[in-house]
Amino acid sequence: VPPIGWF
């Protein structure tokens, strides 16, 4: 699962 901030 990609971390918050991947967006």
Curated annotation (Swiss-Prot):
Keyword terms: Amphibian defense peptide, Secreted
Keyword Secreted set for record: yes
Subcellular location: Secreted
Protein name in the entry: Tryptophyllin-T2-9
Disulfide topology: none
GO cellular component: extracellular region
Family: Belongs to the frog skin active peptide (FSAP) family. Tryptophillin subfamily.
UniProt key word Cytoplasm: no
Expression sites (tissue/organ): Expressed by the skin glands.
One Gene Ontology biological process: defense response
